[in-house]
Amino acid sequence: MMSNSSSEIDVVKTRIPTYDEDDDTILYAYETKPEFVNKEPNIVSDASCNTEEQLKTVNDVLIHCQVIYDAMQNLDKKIDVIRRKVSKIQRFHARSLWTNRKRYGYKKYSYRLAKKLKLQKMKKNEVYESFSYPESYSPTLPVSRRENNSPSNLPRPSFCMEEYQPAEPEEDPILSRTPSPVHPSDFSEHNYQPYYASDGAMYGSSSGPCLGNPRADSIHNTYSTDHASAAPPSVTRSPFENDCYIKEGSITKHPSTWSVEAVVLFLKQTDPVALCPLVDLFRSHEIDGKALLLLTSDVLLKHLGVKLGTAVKLCYYIDRLKQGKCFEN
């Protein structure tokens, strides 16, 4: 049986024959027409319309969510690129700081530009004045240092160079053929024993010639020039003897008792070219003799900001100072 809601136009009515002739029953078969099999019903309920609208809204929301997800993926990629660039910049900055480090003293003492330039100029003048010795050009005079900047305190030479320039006397043809067995280097500075020449004449002490023989002047002049050339090592055996900051003999015996100025003087006179730039740094940190002996290459490089070559030289001089070999001629 076909439902009442179905229309007779949409179906095909077919009579089914019966094999029983006595039976008056008539059977019909109903089949849907092919053109109406896939045809949607014309009448749509309100509930189905609402469902389609909801599905459309959900699809729109899903599409927007997909767009947002794609945008977030792009942002993540860009953030990764930015992080790599920032890390690269940080590594480059750290490398530049390590290679171009300033001295440790400049971190605590930041002067104004004008004041800093003025101090540097004054210190440069002090360095030039400390190494200017107007009387030290003679090989026979001891090296003397200034105690103050005033020119009145400069030491005056006790004798002139003209005393050591021998006059060339006329050579006697008779004495020139007789060799002298005595050499002036056999006598010390305070040896006053008389010596003899080949002609038997006796001369006085080595402090001055005797009269009576023209050969005596030439022997005395030769001895004075040889002795004068050999005398400066004994006179200038220590460059610190005439300094006002250090007592005589204390610079080589007790380096642990040095003051800051004594350490500065040690730097200036040991290696002026390499160690003079460290004078201001040592003064600012107040490095005395005890601190000087405790310095190592790691402390100089990491904490004081000294260059590698200067640190190696200073450690070498400190080791020689500990062994007592720094002031050997």
Curated annotation (Swiss-Prot):
Role: Putative Polycomb group (PcG) protein. PcG proteins act by forming multiprotein complexes, which are required to maintain the transcriptionally repressive state of homeotic genes throughout development. May be involved in spermatogenesis during sexual maturation.
Domain SAM: 258-325
Cellular component, GO annotation: nucleus
Species assigned in the record: Pongo pygmaeus
Xref: Pfam families: SAM_1 (PF00536)
Entry keyword set: Nucleus, Phosphoprotein, Repressor, Transcription, Transcription regulation
Main localisation: nucleus
PROSITE patterns linked: SAM_DOMAIN (PS50105)
Keyword Transcription: yes
Region (Disordered): 136-160
Name of the protein in its database record: Sex comb on midleg-like protein 1
Subcellular location: Nucleus
